[in-house]
Amino acid sequence: MTSADRRRDAVARIIRARRIGTQEELLAALERAGFRATQATLSRDLARLGARRVSGPEGAVYELGADGADGGLAALRGLVSSIAANASMVVIRTHPGSAPAIARAIDLAQPPEVLGTIAGDDTIFVAPAGELRPRRLAARLAELLGTPSALAGEGGERTH
């Protein structure tokens, strides 16, 4: 493993372990872990790791790109405001700026129930695959996103 690989591994560990909001915070944490890097190097490392800043209820923080069976959905829990379904689709409402990241994570997770997603700034349209009923899809998405599913249903009912 090269020194660059070790440094990137350290960056990934730091991002997973702590809420990091700026590159300056990340550089300081990296230095405490025994690694020296410039801001330009760190920026390239973040791009290579697929890291991005995601807005959440407590401000923007760095998160890693999708890695794992859930496409990174676990990291996005808490950013969903509601999930509603009608006879043909599911609508997910999110915190402002979060919809693209959540839609991408859903797409990367490739749940067989999902045909595709379309995201705006704070709203995602989810098309169910095949003959799957949107109510069942809403419940499955609520499970994946850590959102209560008791009220997920058709006819515009909301989960949260």
Swiss-Prot record:
The gene is argR. It comes from Anaeromyxobacter dehalogenans (strain 2CP-1 / ATCC BAA-258). The keyword Zinc-finger does not apply. It is found in: Cytoplasm. Disulfide bonds: none annotated. Pathway: Amino-acid biosynthesis; L-arginine biosynthesis [regulation]. The lineage of its organism: Bacteria, Pseudomonadati, Myxococcota, Myxococcia, Myxococcales. GO terms for cellular component: cytoplasm. PANTHER family: ARGININE REPRESSOR (PTHR34471:SF1). Keywords: Amino-acid biosynthesis, Arginine biosynthesis, Cytoplasm, DNA-binding, Repressor, Transcription, Transcription regulation. It comes from the Bacteria. Belongs to the ArgR family. Regulates arginine biosynthesis genes. Pfam families: Arg_repressor, Arg_repressor_C. This is Arginine repressor.
